[in-house]
Amino acid sequence: EMDVLDDLFEQEYQKKTQQYRDSITLTNVTDRYIVEAEKYIIDGKAEKAIEMLNELLSRNPEQRQQAFIHYTFSEAYKDRGETDKQISELAQTALLDLKSATKEYASLQKLAYLLYDKGDVDRAYKYLNCSMDDAVFCNARLRFIEVAKFFPIIDKTYKLKEERSKFI
């Protein structure tokens, strides 16, 4: 029953995010362009989004905006199936989040998933643990739900790996 409620909560959150993205009036030009780049990605125009994001980065935006730009780059590269570039952009975002002491984020957990898929269980485990701790710290329910869905898989794999290494 909890999974059904969590899924409904997540679906409702995504629906509202889309509604706000469509109707938001942004006073900051950089923020407006980031939202436009997101729309291009959703519309299957990742290349156009990448061009726009490169232009934004060339303007030396503030650190928090840089994090959003790199995260949006990661979404564009995901759309294009360029996993290595997606990982690189998520790592950039995670570093910027760390520098700004941001605790409510998606980048580190997405990075953990991708690293796990590539077989880097140790880093995936560390990053997901950090994501879980930060989600609890700032009471970010959606982030906690997202991490909690995947954590048991990485945790089990990590513990099996640790167990095997004791016997070698």
Question: Residue spans of the language-model regions?
Answer:
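A "functional boundary" signal
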Residues: 1-163
